[in-house]
Amino acid sequence: MKNGNHKINLIPIVESILSIDPRMRFVAIIDLKGNISEAIMKEGKTSLKSQKEEEHFCKQVALRRKIRNEFNKSLGKVGYVHIEREKVTQVVVYPKRKTVYVTMEPNIDTKRKLEIVKLIKAKTTQL
């Protein structure tokens, strides 16, 4: 997974996450400052947000992670965040040095969503 510069090649990870379920829409790996390190939209899907909105949203994801971290000592670390919207389901997973942001179709049952979260965590433990 690492190249000559000891950096992890994120493309195979993002592609692997996107292939977990056919109803996956978008996967982004975000650094702790909110910059998109790698992102892929599933072929045939269109973004519900413009590129500028997507970048702004990723900055907000990083900011919310910082805010949630303030409560780690009293409440424990966040395992993942699951947001249900009318048009899309959003999931955010927090590996150590990156944040994984995923969108999927909203019509997936809860049990399958939990399976997807577990698979994402397994694929991103090294991040």
Positions of predicted regions on the chain:
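Non-catalytic interaction/Regulatory regions outside core domains
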Residues: 1-127
